[in-house]
Amino acid sequence: MYDHLEVEKKWQKYWADHETFKTDVWDFSKPKFYALDMFPYPSGVGLHAGHPEGYTATDIVSRMKRMQGYNVLHPMGYDSFGLPAEQYAVQTGNNPNGFTQTNIKTFTKQLQELGFDYDWSKMIATSDPEFYHWTQWIFKQLYKDGYAKYVDMPVNWCEELGTVLSNDEVIDGKSERGGYPVIRKNMKQLCIDQAAFAERLLEGLNEIDWPESTKEMQRNWIGRSTGVEVQFEIVGGGKFSIFTTCIETIYGITFMVLAPDGDLVQELMPRIKNQEEIKAYIQETVSKSEMDRTELNKGKTGCRLEGIKAINPVNGREVEVFIGDFVLANYGTGAVMAVPSHDQRDFEYAIAHNIDRIQVIEGQDVSEHAFEKQDYLGKGCKLINSEEFTGLTVEEAKVAITKKLVDMGIAKETVNYRFREWIFARQRYWGEPVPIVHLEDGTDYVLPDEELPLILPELEDYKGHNGKAPLENATEWKQYNQNGVKGVRETSTMPGSAGSSWYYLRYIDPHNDKQLADPELLKHWMPVDLYVGGPEHAVGHLMYSRIWNNYLYDKGIVACKEPFKKLVHQGMILGENGIKMGKRFPKYVVNPSDIVKKYGADTLRLYEMFMGPLEQSKPWSMAGCDGARRWIDRVYRLFIESGKITDTNDGKLDKVYNQTVKKVTEDYESLGFNTAISQMMIFVNEAYKADTVYKPYAEGIVKMLSCITPHIGEEMWQLLGHESTIAYEPWPTYDEAKLVEDTITCVVQVNGKVRGKFEAAVGSSNEELQKQAMELETVQRQLEGKTIRKVIVVKGKVVNIVAN
């Protein structure tokens, strides 16, 4: 058994002293490989045992690629703006930067003791002004080009946190962090127009190697639908538009539903006879989250606008108008047409409110439930109760009805998206300051480049008051008066997702103070070749980074549209009781530093890679750590202490060695680390059975194993007689000819019972196999005093002897 603490400390010092993993980004002589981990938020609790799983995966691949002759970039940094540091500042009155820097040091120490091959000279932190200088610069370009803008809109407001939250930060009507109530309220918000990028984001999904489930989540989140926007008149004056993908059902409209919090309802209020009821319902609606309002199993609540009716433009029929919380003011037109015979939600709403139903597509009874488009499209179903369009197929009617409405001048074909504006402001302190000044004349002024970065000011009070941002407390800082321009700075800060939307670019050239990164370097190193991180970021960070990268591509700053060529999601490592580790459940957290101290970092890395497929969630087991350490000791004894290593090859391990090199190489490429380890275990078992182990074979196994267990890999490499690091040694190769089986195992049966087996050369004739079978001592004993009646040879498998 080796001393893991001594060995690991020794090699970590060696790597640091020799800058072993420092990447010369200007070396274009080798093919490049850019491996990236989703960088962590440096929380106060430090790393837990779940963190190293994904980090080890990229580490293994990047180490292999380095040995294969690639110039590897494998950086690490910190997503260091965020709410926990802000809450610390509010509670203690201390600037969150000190708290954050302390946490970064803790995280860095933990990562370094795990032996990852990160180039620490390229470390970044999103809260570093040298970094957020360029976050502000990119935002400035987005603002100047009209993609970032101020919009009056309903938002998720958390009074307890004193800030606006994005949809992905709200779970079941409560804030993701802290579980505080979230309500909807109208506010002027700084937003980024995501929908402007929708088509290219959808197209780009076809060009990247990502999990299909993640791509589908993004498609659904974007929510592209093609349909018709139709204008409806209101009896007594006024009009509104609806968007529908089912224009063929327009003759089946029996009511309309408006968003309770939309402007139209307020405009109609003087004509509404049941105003008190309507106002109460509106008040009830704004207390609900968007998710609660749009959940499919809900949507039956609402109120009829007494005194208000709409006119169906195709037949002049007057229909009732309702408000319902499932209609959102900021989605589509904020109004929907309701066809209860052909939409299940409308059907249930009609039942609840005693509204008529009109069937307009034949083919199914609609007395119990709606006959919906997924059931009638492409089935040859025809229209009924639809005037001149009766008898047409659904597909024919779509075209004909659309043409009629367009010719009437009240409709247009259009594309709609579920995609909303990305709210790009938070009423928090610990985030990037927005480089905008609000002038007295109501216009906005964007800071010139020479005034970037706009640095966060120190505050005496880090808590916002009365719904205002904490930066409102910076009375001197917020007053702007330079070069004849006077105004008040924007006091909201950018969301936590701002820095992570482009950080992968900064790693390439992290100390450039003239531009976010050198264009030549960006062209060479992008896109990221392998990106590993959790699936929970599918419609957040992974969407935002694609938007920013597409925008920077349009600007000619990056040379590729998509930032991440291949994406892999690691599964969660759960506590021994199956509970997720993390800051929400601290008592279930396994501290990797404790494992490193007891077993060694190599053991932790090996165990986590051997637990099962990378993408699956797996429960932690201390017994698994014991087993992993015992196997590492077994390998060490074989190669260093057994005395079996020789410069002469007897050929007995040729096949298993070449099979191992082939399988481990392929498995590392596909991130199938558990099966790669299994194959190395097979080799080690065979090597223990052998009299000697050919030294180049031992060295090849050590090279491959060193990607998973780098410290003991380096140590064994040195003890095998090498002076330089293993990190840049050439990757092992295999001989295809030696992968083929050159012998077969043949079983011998006498009267149907197995009596022995033997090894024979591949291609042996039946006569040769029969001869070898007869020479077995156990077979000869069974045949004593008997006459052989028949010998049946199943070539390559069995020699069956019948005797009596």
Give the residues covered by each predicted segment.
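Conserved oxyanion/phosphate-binding beta-strand-loop segments in alpha/beta enzyme cores
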Residues: 1-36, 66-75, 98-106, 210, ...
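NTP-handling and nucleic-acid-processing catalytic cores
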Residues: 2-12, 135-362, 465-468, 472-483, ...
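Residue patterns forming the tRNA-binding/recognition surfaces of aminoacyl-tRNA synthetases
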Residues: 10, 14-18, 91-247, 335-451, ...
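N-terminal catalytic cores of NTP/NDP-binding nucleotidyl/phosphoryl-transfer enzymes
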Residues: 24-96, 100, 124-138, 244-245, ...
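Glycine- and acidic
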Residues: 38-47, 119-124, 328-336, 383-387, ...
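Helix-rich, typically C-terminal accessory recognition domains appended to large enzymatic cores
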Residues: 144-156, 332, 413-442, 594-759, ...
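Conserved phosphate/anionic-ligand binding catalytic regions in large, soluble enzymes, centered on
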Residues: 240-262, 422, 428-430, 434, ...
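Alpha-helical recognition segments enriched in aromatics with Gly/Pro capping
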Residues: 308-314, 318-331, 360, 473-616
